[in-house]
């Protein structure tokens, strides 16, 4: 932290990047920081939350945050201006962080006009999750064909063995040389000589992410993003325990008492304790209440952005020592258990409203929460909540799940059966049929038109019956809910689906079969990857399909390759099984050369 000196003159805004850093460096830093990185703008009015700053060093102190009492009388939030931002990287771990200089928002700070239309050079980049083959001592780094063409310098394909030397610079300014060639069977882009030295120096393992960025001038940059399990809360070389105890709060207090600047360390994966002034006001004006449905952006294990859904079940102070603070003031219940569970308490600016709040008793929400905690392991349909996106769906398209496609899942069959309307009141469900007519519903409506067989009247020999009675579609929905609830009593688990959902499911199911072609065999086969658990089962299944038992396991005579959507041909087994299933389009069994 900077020492607190009184600032009498107007401070100079030094900018987000100093003179020694290029625009390509900035883009590389952002890619290494991740999809959820939210750095404030230079000169922006923000709120600084000391609680969030303290949370950054929670692991270092090994104490619960609600036990950390303020050592001085400091408000829960402080209004500031962003004076300077410097994007940096930790020396030992290559973790990105930003040094942000703040100043109490006063008239002394003059913000220069920012040119929003400033020319930005074109930058090409790609990221890839490293496989075991990429990090092996005797292997190289496989670059997908599309990324090699767009991001790397062009190879001279007229040569028998196209090759070139690449010079890449990391965030520390260190230079790395790689031999880029196009070879192998099948041929593909590889980084060989120099790659092993890079992975060893950076201590890379399978699951880490490699980032390449290339500017218009040919400047090539390389960076890494470590897997979540390798990261700590804060680099020890930046902030110590004593600094957390006395420096974080004391320096902020000193800065506001003396109207001087102070600098904080801001990590992309930490909670947002520097929040845009406008974003904070929007979040507060939303008035999140108990029962409100929300969505929140979270980072998945594959470094992609996920949209998760939940319900607010409480509003209270996160710490008794910081009264009336908006920091993590919302207690939430997540819809589904995931491998990276979301926080139990969130801040209003971290989430987005799905729909207006519903007046739901807190006791009912807590009861359902306890029921889910008991049944969430081993039960896939134990609650009435919208599903999150699966990893495969995210790889194909990052999108927000519409609240109109929320599936019905039931918590307590006995209670719900006694009061089906409770389901419709407690959580958002499908709109009523009058808003969602389709062919299937219209057919059902027509079938529900019945004629009473009471007294018949004749007029000129024609029988006149009583008018037809049309059943209320709302009653029909309630009846369907009762039927499904009764089914669950006998161990059945069902889900209401619209015809569109059923059609989409049938379409996705038909895509699970992958075509397989074997050299020398005219007629191909098809294999269903969704029923297999790994490469070993795939090899056994292929041997059965072509009646070549034992010949594929030894790999002395045959080898297995596949093509992706870009028609790139690669060997089977170099990628994690889920990633392989997502990108494979066709499998080939060919003679080994």
From Swiss-Prot:
Domain of life: Eukaryota
Keyword annotations: Auxin signaling pathway, DNA-binding, Nucleus, Transcription, Transcription regulation
Predominant localisation class: nucleus
DNA-binding region: 126-228
Nucleotide-binding recorded as keyword: no
Keyword Nucleus: yes
GO cellular component: nucleus
Molecular function in Gene Ontology: DNA-binding transcription factor activity; transcription cis-regulatory region binding
PB1 domain segment(s): 511-592
Cited InterPro entries: ARF_dom (IPR010525), ARF_plant (IPR044835), AUX/IAA_dom (IPR033389), B3_DNA-bd (IPR003340), DNA-bd_pseudobarrel_sf (IPR015300), PB1-like (IPR053793)
GO biological process: auxin-activated signaling pathway
Entry's localization field: Nucleus
Family: Belongs to the ARF family.
Oligomeric and partner information: Homodimers and heterodimers.
Domain notes: Interactions between auxin response factors (ARFs) and Aux/IAA proteins occur through their C-terminal dimerization domains III and IV.
PANTHER family cross-referenced by the UniProt entry: AUXIN RESPONSE FACTOR 12-RELATED, AUXIN RESPONSE FACTOR 4-RELATED
UniProt protein name: Auxin response factor 12
Organism: Arabidopsis thaliana (Mouse-ear cress)
Record lineage: Eukaryota, Viridiplantae, Streptophyta, Embryophyta, Tracheophyta
